[in-house]
């Protein structure tokens, strides 16, 4: 179970770094704002689900 937690935490950290780069780039691109808005929304919701998942795994370990 500890290995699953560590892998999930690593994925969360890497995904967070990806969002740190991608969100400002999407905000600065003036073209096709509705598509960028949807990508940011889905990416943020996925991040929240990953945080909750890591929290649950941390509680179970």
Swiss-Prot record:
GO terms for cellular component: photosystem II reaction center; plasma membrane-derived thylakoid membrane. InterPro entries: PSII_PsbZ, PSII_PsbZ_sf. It is a multi-pass membrane protein. GO terms for biological process: photosynthesis; photosystem II stabilization. It comes from the Bacteria. It is found in: Cellular thylakoid membrane. The chain crosses the membrane at residues 8-28, 41-61. Gene3D superfamilies: Photosystem II PsbZ, reaction centre. Keywords: Membrane, Photosynthesis, Photosystem II, Reaction center, Thylakoid, Transmembrane, Transmembrane helix. May control the interaction of photosystem II (PSII) cores with the light-harvesting antenna, regulates electron flow through the 2 photosystem reaction centers. PSII is a light-driven water plastoquinone oxidoreductase, using light energy to abstract electrons from H(2)O, generating a proton gradient subsequently used for ATP formation. HAMAP family: PSII_PsbZ. PSII is composed of 1 copy each of membrane proteins PsbA, PsbB, PsbC, PsbD, PsbE, PsbF, PsbH, PsbI, PsbJ, PsbK, PsbL, PsbM, PsbT, PsbX, PsbY, PsbZ, Psb30/Ycf12, peripheral proteins PsbO, CyanoQ (PsbQ), PsbU, PsbV and a large number of cofactors. It forms dimeric complexes. Belongs to the PsbZ family. This is Photosystem II reaction center protein Z. It comes from Synechococcus sp. (strain JA-2-3B'a(2-13)). The lineage of its organism: Bacteria, Bacillati, Cyanobacteriota, Cyanophyceae, Synechococcales. The gene is psbZ.
């Amino acid at each position: 179970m500890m290995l699953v937690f560590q892998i999930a935490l690593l994925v969360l950290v890497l995904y967070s770094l990806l969002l740190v780069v991608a969100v400002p780039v999407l905000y600065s691109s003036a073209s096709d704002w509705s598509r960028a808005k949807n990508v940011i929304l889905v990416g943020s919701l996925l991040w929240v689900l990953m945080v909750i998942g890591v929290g649950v795994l941390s509680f179970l370990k």
